[in-house]
């Protein structure tokens, strides 16, 4: 089609749909014996958008994956943490089932179940939340609890979390209200002491109080397109009762709180049993017995714990699990670097002893899976720097000595004479 003002005969042209002449519209698009103006094109687009909105809910209703399907998808990206994956699969399924049935079922109002993830650094808390959002195709944003303060103090206001979520979906409120918010380092906003203080705790208990309504469900007023708030401005109204909040933290020292309760015989939930001091449980076993009273003792206020009814604990990753993480998930670290090298036309091979050495280093650093990338990056840095300037390299081999910094990666060339020259 072409943009026309007049045909070859100089006749005045009219839109075939609305009848307006070429002088009454900005553009007139010509087809075989027909014309359409820019106004009719806009109208057609609006009609199509409305129809898509009406069809979308029916499509979404049939697209909700079952807990088994959610769990299998998580298995593709997250190694281990079987109990946490099962808890998350059920909680997420129930949350979105509630949304699709209008918060009620046979007159019974369905409550909201936000999630608390407890586990050491690098155990997969953030990855689980990100993978869920990707599977469900919903907006996802992360917030760091350590940067949050009460409104009116220097720092990030809790409502900025909703603004970030809106930014992820181009300020589409309906999309944002189906999103997932992950708040990391939630343990860092614990109350500084068991006793209420006369001084204001604006980054601890104060933030917990500020988050209460947001997590439970309120209508947050957010400035459009990230502007500052002022009285004459119209705000976007976002209903947070439909947003799934997942809070995560390492909760260092919580195992000692649980151990003290269990040893003194006050544990009654999650199959907690009285243990002698000589019979020490592992940190993972203790965290699995967490009760609300332990979290209160740690420094979370009771009202805040009540807004996070689903609790999942993650274990510290073993050396074997770290090796699996390096090679088994769909986006495993070794696969990522192999794809990167393939873009240069070069194969990359990690020998088994190299994977063992990477896992041992990460265990020594106590950074969990998060530390794996920095170890691999350091080992491959010089090779990635030189490779684009080199010719005839077909393969790069990484073994244990490369990871430990004792030798350089083995380069295999396409031409034997080039390899011989490299080895001299």
From Swiss-Prot:
<dbReference type="GO" id="GO:0005524">
    <property type="term" value="F:ATP binding"/>
</dbReference>
<keyword id="KW-0143">Chaperone</keyword>
<dbReference type="Pfam" id="PF10431">
    <property type="entry name" value="ClpB_D2-small"/>
</dbReference>
<dbReference type="GO" id="GO:0009376">
    <property type="term" value="C:HslUV protease complex"/>
</dbReference>
<protein>
    <recommendedName>
        <fullName>ATP-dependent Clp protease ATP-binding subunit ClpX</fullName>
    </recommendedName>
</protein>
<dbReference type="GO" id="GO:0051301">
    <property type="term" value="P:cell division"/>
</dbReference>
<comment type="function">
    <text>ATP-dependent specificity component of the Clp protease. It directs the protease to specific substrates. Can perform chaperone functions in the absence of ClpP.</text>
</comment>
<feature type="binding site">
    <location>
        <position position="37"/>
    </location>
    <ligand>
        <name>Zn(2+)</name>
    </ligand>
</feature>
<dbReference type="InterPro" id="IPR003959">
    <property type="entry name" value="ATPase_AAA_core"/>
</dbReference>
<dbReference type="InterPro" id="IPR010603">
    <property type="entry name" value="Znf_CppX_C4"/>
</dbReference>
<feature type="domain" description="ClpX-type ZB">
    <location>
        <begin position="2"/>
        <end position="56"/>
    </location>
</feature>
<dbReference type="Pfam" id="PF06689">
    <property type="entry name" value="zf-C4_ClpX"/>
</dbReference>
<dbReference type="GO" id="GO:0046983">
    <property type="term" value="F:protein dimerization activity"/>
</dbReference>
<dbReference type="GO" id="GO:0016887">
    <property type="term" value="F:ATP hydrolysis activity"/>
</dbReference>
<dbReference type="InterPro" id="IPR027417">
    <property type="entry name" value="P-loop_NTPase"/>
</dbReference>
<dbReference type="InterPro" id="IPR019489">
    <property type="entry name" value="Clp_ATPase_C"/>
</dbReference>
<comment type="similarity">
    <text>Belongs to the ClpX chaperone family.</text>
</comment>
<dbReference type="GO" id="GO:0140662">
    <property type="term" value="F:ATP-dependent protein folding chaperone"/>
</dbReference>
<keyword id="KW-0479">Metal-binding</keyword>
<dbReference type="InterPro" id="IPR050052">
    <property type="entry name" value="ATP-dep_Clp_protease_ClpX"/>
</dbReference>
<keyword id="KW-0862">Zinc</keyword>
<keyword id="KW-0067">ATP-binding</keyword>
<feature type="binding site">
    <location>
        <begin position="120"/>
        <end position="127"/>
    </location>
    <ligand>
        <name>ATP</name>
    </ligand>
</feature>
<dbReference type="InterPro" id="IPR003593">
    <property type="entry name" value="AAA+_ATPase"/>
</dbReference>
<dbReference type="InterPro" id="IPR046425">
    <property type="entry name" value="ClpX_bact"/>
</dbReference>
<dbReference type="InterPro" id="IPR038366">
    <property type="entry name" value="Znf_CppX_C4_sf"/>
</dbReference>
<keyword id="KW-0547">Nucleotide-binding</keyword>
<feature type="binding site">
    <location>
        <position position="18"/>
    </location>
    <ligand>
        <name>Zn(2+)</name>
    </ligand>
</feature>
<comment type="subunit">
    <text>Component of the ClpX-ClpP complex. Forms a hexameric ring that, in the presence of ATP, binds to fourteen ClpP subunits assembled into a disk-like structure with a central cavity, resembling the structure of eukaryotic proteasomes.</text>
</comment>
<feature type="binding site">
    <location>
        <position position="15"/>
    </location>
    <ligand>
        <name>Zn(2+)</name>
    </ligand>
</feature>
<feature type="binding site">
    <location>
        <position position="40"/>
    </location>
    <ligand>
        <name>Zn(2+)</name>
    </ligand>
</feature>
<dbReference type="InterPro" id="IPR004487">
    <property type="entry name" value="Clp_protease_ATP-bd_su_ClpX"/>
</dbReference>
<dbReference type="GO" id="GO:0008270">
    <property type="term" value="F:zinc ion binding"/>
</dbReference>
<dbReference type="Pfam" id="PF07724">
    <property type="entry name" value="AAA_2"/>
</dbReference>
<dbReference type="GO" id="GO:0051082">
    <property type="term" value="F:unfolded protein binding"/>
</dbReference>
<dbReference type="GO" id="GO:0051603">
    <property type="term" value="P:proteolysis involved in protein catabolic process"/>
</dbReference>
């Amino acid at each position: 089609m072409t943009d026309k003002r007049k045909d070859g005969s100089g006749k005045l042209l009219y839109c075939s749909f609305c009848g307006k002449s070429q002088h009454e519209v900005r553009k007139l698009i010509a087809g075989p014996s027909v014309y359409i103006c820019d106004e009719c094109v806009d109208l057609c687009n609006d009609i199509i958008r409305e129809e898509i909105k009406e069809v979308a809910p029916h499509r979404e209703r049939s697209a909700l994956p079952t807990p088994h399907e959610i769990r299998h998808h998580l298995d593709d990206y997250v190694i281990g943490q079987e109990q946490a994956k099962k808890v998350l699969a059920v909680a997420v399924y129930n949350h979105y089932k509630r949304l699709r049935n209008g918060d009620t079922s046979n007159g019974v109002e369905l409550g909201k179940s936000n999630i608390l993830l407890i586990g050491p650094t690098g155990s997969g808390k953030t990855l689980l939340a990100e993978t869920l959002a990707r599977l469900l195709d919903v907006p996802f944003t992360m917030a760091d609890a350590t940067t949050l303060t009460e409104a009116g103090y220097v720092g990030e206001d809790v409502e900025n979390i909703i603004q970030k979520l809106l930014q992820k979906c181009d300020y589409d409120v309906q999309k944002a209200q189906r999103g997932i918010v992950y708040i990391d380092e939630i343990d860092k906003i614990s109350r500084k002491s068991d006793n209420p203080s006369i001084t204001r705790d604006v980054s601890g208990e104060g933030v917990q109080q500020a988050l209460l309504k947001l997590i439970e469900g309120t209508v947050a007023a957010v400035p459009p397109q990230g502007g500052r708030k002022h009285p004459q401005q119209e705000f976007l109204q976002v209903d947070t009762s439909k947003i799934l909040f997942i809070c995560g933290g390492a909760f260092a020292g919580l195992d000692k709180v649980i151990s003290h309760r269990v040893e003194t015989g006050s544990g009654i939930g999650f199959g907690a049993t009285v243990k002698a001091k000589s019979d020490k449980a592992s940190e993972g076993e203790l965290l699995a017995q967490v009760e609300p009273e332990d979290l209160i003792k740690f420094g979370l206020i009771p009202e805040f714990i009540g807004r996070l009814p689903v609790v999942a604990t993650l274990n510290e990753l073993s050396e074997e699990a770290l090796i699996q993480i390096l090679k088994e998930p769909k986006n495993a670290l070794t696969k990522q670097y192999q794809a990167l090298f393939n873009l240069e036309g070069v194969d990359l091979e990690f020998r088994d002893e190299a994977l063992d050495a990477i896992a041992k280093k990460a265990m020594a650093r106590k950074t969990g899976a998060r530390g794996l990338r920095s170890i691999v990056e350091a080992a491959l840095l010089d090779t990635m720097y030189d490779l684009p300037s080199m010719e005839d390299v077909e393969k790069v081999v990484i073994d244990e000595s490369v990871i430990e910094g004792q030798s350089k990666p083995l380069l295999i060339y396409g031409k034997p004479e080039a390899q011989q020259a490299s080895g001299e």
